[in-house]
Amino acid sequence: MRNNFLLSLVALTLIFTSCANDDTADIVFNITNNNGGGGTSVDTDVFLSGTYTNDLTLDANINYKINGSLVIADGATLTIPAGMTIKALAAGSDVYVAISQGAKIIAEGTANSPIVFTSDASEPKAGDWGGLILLGKAPINSVTGTATSTSEIAGLPYGGNIANDNSGSLKYVRIEYSGGSADGQSENNGLSFYGVGNGTEVDYIQIYEGKDDGVEFFGGTVNVSHVAVMDLQDDSIDWTEGYSGTITDVYIQHIQNPTETFNSDKAFECDGYNDDFGNNSNPVFFSNPTVTNVTIVGVGSDNTFQDGKIINAGQYEAVRLRRGTAAIFSNVQITGFGEAFDVDGNDTSDPTGQAIVDDELQVNNVTFTDVTTKFKNDTGNDTLTEADFISGDGNGTGTDFATWGSGWTK
């Protein structure tokens, strides 16, 4: 019996070694024989990393751990069944999942059986691993036509001229303890969309306790809905590079017991173009998304420090709009911030203020609670007033997170 088991194990190893060589990927089985001489019982962990050029369908009966960069190449599809928990080694920025241009991810959980990406640490924390990266062929404003840019993490191409590009489907997916830092500038987000098109389906997503941003859009046209971002140490939602999709039903909750080193930044950081790496000082067009049904929960409008700890982080803006971005926000609730909307830039390269004048940057139906400043005008255009930017003050109801977030979020 023991010899038969060992022969089977050798055969299994050879099969997966062959697959690994074909796909230029690493598949490692840790198999423990627990039969005690009285039968066969096999406990299996499958470690995943490398580049997959063929489809990869995960088995719900196997424990998967990501131990490096897992890249799904052009033409391949990663399929993850509902209810799976996929753990990543707590090794920081080098552990991530990337869906390349031309590849797809099909990760469709349910409210009762969400798909979870998390850390394998016994005491998990923000930044344990990288995150999930999707790269598509939709337009970005740093290049024209079919030209591409290169992603901050993984160094993969993104962008193009296919607005309805399809990178797959994400439904009822929770991403925990992401945001591992590569260096002083390059950090993983929980969920990064690089030039992702609106043929991609994204609905019911939670980012929980990440070290960097929760969700970031680098151009593209992808539409997302039912997004919960909670207890992030940086911004909750970012956009840049000409993002022009829709963001519908958003719940953002900042760290409720912050310290000087453990606190949230902005709920939304919104850029018309990306100059973080000097790659786009002359954008082809500016970001212009539509954001609807939003609830943002801060920790109070006061700005008080005591014994080196932030008692209330009201110095942070809820929403920062800059670098020429346009956007229409509708039905918004903001609670507990020193500033609600901070708008920067009004010169030729940063025409954010002009977007207000042109009615392309507006907030419609919003309710402020415990907010000191509703509209901070840093555009350089002193003629702009709160009334030019905000309408329907007191009419915002936000999103019904208690209903749509029930059962699958933390």
Q: Could you say what each language-model-derived stretch is?
A:
Residues 6-13:
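Sec-dependent N-terminal signal peptides
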Residues 20-23:
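Bacterial signal peptide processing site
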Residues 25-73, 77-78, 89-102, 109, ...:
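Extracellular beta-rich repeat passengers
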Residues 1-5:
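Positively charged n-region of N-terminal signal peptides that target proteins for export
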Residues 15-18:
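C-terminal motif of bacterial Sec signal peptides marking the signal peptidase cleavage site
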